[in-house]
Amino acid sequence: MSRIGILSERIKGRREEIESRGQTFYQGPSQINLASFPPKERWDDWVELDSKAWPNRVEHHSMLVPTTCFNCESACGLLAYVDRETLTVRKFEGNPEHPGSRGRNCAKGPATLNQITDPDRILYPLKRVGPRGSGRFERVSWEEASNDIASRIRQAITEERQNEIMIHLGRPGEDGYTERVLAAWGVDGHNSHTNVCSSGGRAGYHYWSGIDRPSADFANAKVIYLISSHLETGHYFNPHAQRITEARERGAKLIVVDTRLSNTATHADLWLSPWPGSEAAMNLAFCNYLIQNGMYNEEFVRTWWNWQEYMAALHPGEDPTFENFQNRLKEEYARYTFEFAAKETGVSEAVLRETAELIATAGTAFSSHNWRSAAAGNLGGWQVSRSIFMINALLGAVATEGGTHLNAWNKYVPKPIYTPPHPKVWNELSWPIEFPLAMNELSFMLPHLMDHTGRRLEVYFTRVYNPVWTNPDGFSWIEMFLDPKKVGCYVALTPTWNETAFFADYVLPMGHSSERHDTHSYEQYDGQWLGFRQPVIRAAKERLGEKVADTRAVNPGEVWEENEFYIDLSWRIDPDGSLGIRQYFESKANPGEMLTVEEYYSWMFNNSVPGLKEAAKAEGLDPMQYMRRYGAFEVSKKIGTVYAQPVPEDELEDIQVSPTGRVFTRAPKPASPNVVPTGDPAPDDEGRRPVGVMAGDQILRGFPTPSGRLEFYSSTLATWGWKEYAIPTYIESHVHQSKLASGEMPLISTFRLPVQIHTRSANSKWLDEIAHTNPLWINPIDANRMGVKDGNLLRVNTDLGYFVVKAWVTEGIRPGVVACSHHMGRWKINDDFGSRAMMRTVTLKQDGSRWNLDPSKGVEPYKSSDPDTSRIWWTDVGVHQNLTFGVHPDPVSGMHCWHQVVRVTKAEAGDRHGEVFVDTAKSKEVFRRWMEMARPAYQVSPDSTRRPRWLLRPLKPTAAAFALPDRG
């Protein structure tokens, strides 16, 4: 018998013992009867022995309380071990009841413990004293801060200055709560980080399908194709990585496209390292291979592509037969040969052919993914995701087992207790007329848009967002904050200190993962689940019979949560209900009283989550108790091909069918408890809503696009000024080799590290010890040419200025390209506030438009309530490169195109590691240059509206607000 077999036999009684008591055994990954987690039946009193007390037997009794990690978008389940005596959190582990993460976590999950015990965290509301940017604050009460903020908002609303109110979100971590708050206020004030994150990726999927995110069924795939580093970072790293690994164990092949040798690439069967921005050329070469060789799913293309619309628009004189379309398809893509793709990418024809042949073997079990990566880095990056999905669309691998689904079908957003009407106004600071097809708000250009439009903000919130650090051109943001005529009151809602908060008027402490309420659902497999984040000490006290009315009562200091804060703030904005706001924050159970989070989520779980009542009843619980007990619920184990479902007869009333098979009905849309957003195609001329498509003699559900089918041909792009991009094509990036002068090279700055959290992990000692700096990746060929060795200081010169960084000479980056990771180069402007373990102290110097960030004091050990801070050994915290980047808005998607054209030189005398220089006058020149590529709605709108109304848009205003204003 093998060692594993012997061990299994020895401990088998442990499993039998658990199951004999009628308790749940959670199988460990070893598959040898070791349990991964305590049985859920013992979560009220789990006993562990203190390992440090051995050989004495010292017991620790814990309550295991579920919550959800807030340290990336994956929203993995956590179990907090709450000490029954002290009611403090001892540790965090995975939650085996969470369908997405299935009990597993990356390093960021357990590191939540560092965040809640961080000695430098913000514990009380703070108000600025002295000028903005002085970094001087005093403690104030929540009452004082909330009253001041509410009075400003109330005055702006009553004076019809609704567009001067804005909430700018970083990591949302929730589904729709903040949007509903803004809708209740009647303001178009939602801003997000999406255009520095994923708008490029979203656009490509949206124009195909009417849904803006992929949902790959990795676990069942035969071939997995990643333009990402998905085994180590990204959306949704941990849940996806474990399923990719399972597929590979069953024989699936993994193709990774990444200019960098990422950890993911090291696991690939095929790693392709293309020139940055050439990825769409590669994808289209694979498409061309399938097309020219007839290796695509003809029946799927015939049924589900809008090829008839393509023929009518571009070849009106031809007989619109499928055979003629097939011939045209061959002609359209004939130029995307392996020879062409090899020239663009630098990947050999042989490797491209090998990859195409492998893809062709997948059939409908082809899972692909692109989210940020190349789609976020390049001008025209949205064609990367559009072309990768074209491979799926050719193979018919759309919502199939092992194929790529669409996120709205694998996501569950329960309808809340109130749904306020959407605003009647349009905010041009977020949605400027120059970018009618932008997928999301042009958030990263806010300082430039203020100058461009002459508009201002009375109250500006950031919520877990750090624009001075995260966005390009951070010094322009600092200039905006320093001008009180542009921003009347800036409120930073944040659990941690960040660079932007130093310029705030109020810094208000918000909770971490275990200190707040949220619901969320993400597409991680072909099913649907709902997660519930909760304050774990509150839940623990309630298990012990104590009622908690306010989360501040159980959080450290006076740390609050956005849910309760926004309810309270809304009552202060509209104390008597005369503005029509308070009604959306009143209790239904007790009219006239303030809505509580308990009632908000109880109503949701009771009324909007199919199957939850029954599951709870089976355990003698109500739905709210069930979610507090387990932290997650699987709504559906499998969804399948939604687009191929027949439309029920009761939805077919007085139907009309368009020449291309789009079916319209007068029957009202059935109410759904799932309010996940999708595309919203327009009704027909007589007001019938689109309900499906004709597929043979059946009416099937189809896709939420104008045609109801997958839109190979986008009438939206064609009629809104971009005819040349009506079908998937290749756009040369702004870092294309032909556009580089001698000595210039692309800088890749978008990649993330597995153990860092954007800019929210400077307060996590375990993560910071593992990764705390960001050297410049440079190939030995380039390093030898320049005479550079490991650790040498380099100047990286950009359009705006330069930053000084250490060299890392590695074959992990292709020659002619350099790379520098996200997260690092954190700084603070004094020693009074900030995360001392990862933020160096700097001096900011301004001379007109010229700014210097000069390091003045490094990271060093210090004494605090945590003895580990005296053991800090690292001093190098990297460089803040984003400050030196100009804004690069893609003229179609609106995405900031992150890749930079740079000149790398040896550092000059006096240069210091981490030093940054920027001239914001040059940033204005870059803004104007990129704005020249835009095609404003005034020039291209076919119907005198600002934007196609069917496209997804957060907080979508009323139809009247879409009308273009007079140009006068």
Q: What do the predicted segments below correspond to?
A:
Residues 178-245, 250-255, 281, 388-506, ...:
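Extended redox/cofactor-interaction regions of prokaryotic respiratory oxidoreductases
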Residues 146-164, 214-223, 332, 353-368, ...:
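Glycine-rich phosphate/diphosphate-binding loops that line cofactor/substrate pockets in enzymes
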Residues 811-824:
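Short, solvent-exposed secondary-structure boundary/capping segments
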Residues 1-296, 348, 461-463, 507, ...:
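N-terminal export/assembly segments and adjacent metallocofactor-ligating motifs
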Residues 790-801:
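Short conserved beta-strand and strand-loop elements enriched in small hydrophobics
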Residues 535-632, 636-637, 641, 649, ...:
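Long, C-terminal catalytic modules of enzymes
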Residues 251, 255, 260-363:
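Long, well-ordered, tryptophan-enriched scaffold segments
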Residues 805-809:
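Short beta-strand-centered aromatic/proline hotspots
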